[in-house]
Amino acid sequence: MSLNPRDVVIVDFGRTPMGRSKGGMHRNTRAEDMSAHLISKVLERNSKVDPGEVEDVIWGCVNQTLEQGWNIARMASLMTQIPHTSAAQTVSRLCGSSMSALHTAAQAIMTGNGDVFVVGGVEHMGHVSMMHGVDPNPHMSLYAAKASGMMGLTAEMLGKMHGISREQQDAFAVRSHQLAHKATVEGKFKDEIIPMQGYDENGFLKIFDYDETIRPDTTLESLAALKPAFNPKGGTVTAGTSSQITDGASCMIVMSAQRAKDLGLEPLAVIRSMAVAGVDPAIMGYGPVPATQKALKRAGLNMADIDFIELNEAFAAQALPVLKDLKVLDKMNEKVNLHGGAIALGHPFGCSGARISGTLLNVMKQNGGTFGLSTMCIGLGQGIATVFERV
């Protein structure tokens, strides 16, 4: 494949094991430490990359307060081998934060404003709860329905609009856990999970190299017993069909194609297009549809050209309508989230965009795909998408 010098390539990707936010493996690890450990280890395994060449560390994080405050990108960067002369910024596009971090780095590379970037994101939802310090403007209800800020209710709305049944949602959730467990057992996550110290349920310190969030014993029967989590009367969305509240971080090394070539590196993929889009906040989960349509148009592709897809599983009731309208629902088992998704692995807000993108690149590498799409919905009505081509 012939690459242009300013094409944007992904050199490597790593992530932490995903930990449960309630009493999980990361309960005694701070978000900055988690991020710094991950960045350091990813750089260590790419010895041809001089940390001094890093132009900027761009880190996604949603709730930027407590240990995640004061520009956590810089806080983490200072605790790594990256010199103080490299810059760092923290970005937030809610659920799409670390994918936005990737886009920001890509746009800088394309315009000649740097050659080497470290991007990713973190969210420690056990230490900094999703609503900590949040004070929504009461006047917002004049412009958008109050329930638009309640993600579970927006999923209920989207599922109802598209005729998604409780049974379909439960089956989707079981699939997520089964595929994530299968990927774990078969070593499919080995290249992406960076082992970390953590604490087991008995309080013993150990090395984790697997996601503790996956529940392989999940069944249709066990999910059917759960009560609706957001709309007690007539709702279909349960805790079992929603993304898990978890702690985790993800990291990528992103470069210009020319710099990667100069260093003798073999990239995982090149970015072919990027897009963001807005939708009515009441159906925030629909955002991946217009974002994907824009990204495909910019890449000169259509859905039939896409070999593999990673769609963030915010809710089964949200993911299924998106797949339906992208015309890939009937191809889900061949193309979509082949290693499970956020229902099994969790959705640490600031981490997820780079996480699903990196997992996608590994799926493409393991299965020989050419084009891949990573996309996700974003709270308050947005979507974000990236199209990759395997190098």
From Swiss-Prot:
GO terms for biological process: fatty acid beta-oxidation; phenylacetate catabolic process. It comes from the Bacteria. It is found in: Cytoplasm. Signal peptide: none annotated. Pfam families: Thiolase_C, Thiolase_N. Its main location: cytoplasm. GO terms for cellular component: cytoplasm. The active site is at C95 (acyl-thioester intermediate), H347 (proton acceptor), C377 (proton acceptor). This is 3-ketoacyl-CoA thiolase. The gene is fadA.
